[in-house]
Every structure is written in C-alpha cells, then in structure tokens.
C-alpha cells in the first residue's frame, strides 16, 4: 500500500481513508524541496463546492467535514469575493502556501475546470487567510 496508516509518519483522521503528514516526514519534505509531496485531494470530493452551493447542513456527515475544513468552508464567500475567484481557487490556494512544493490531486470535470484550476497560480493569496 502507498499509505501505511499505522506508521509513525501518517496518522489517520476521523475517516480512516484520510491521512495527514506529520513529524519527521513533514520535516523531510520541507527540507528537500526537490521532492514533491502529494497531499490528499484538494477539492475533498466536492466538500467545499457542496458547502458553497448548499450550506453547512448539506455536508453534515460528509467524511471531509472536519473542524478545520468547516472553518475554511465558512470563509469561502468572503475569500472568493476578496480574490474575485472560484471556490476551486480558494481550495487549491492552500497548497500554493505550503512550505514545500505540493501537487494536489485534482480531478477536473472538463476543459473549463482545468482553466479555472490553472488560474490559481495567477492569484497572490495572503497566508493569513489560511492561518486558522
């Protein structure tokens, strides 16, 4: 398996299909910038888009409805207006601010989705918008 959920470097979250990188493995990627880290899917199986279009009630019970994701989701309207961009850009913007290069796993729905996602690199996000 690519992800060993029992290792000291990866810890399972509420949903055991999700993991986060911590400790030595995080430090390794931060110090070795020629390596790419592939974090979990940036759009979280549509979690943020569902929240943006249908509200918090619609994502109750969703596997990505963690407190940190809900904090970010509650700010989507404010941030999409601030940066004049799409929800996709706000979500992918998180990865542009990591301390090491990230390649989010992103599944576009078509050519327009690819263009929208690529626009993320044209936006200068304020790290404070993602500090919570």
Predicted regions and their residues:
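Beta/alpha (TIM)-barrel catalytic core signal, keyed to glycine-rich beta->alpha loops juxtaposed to Asp/Glu
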Residues: 1-131
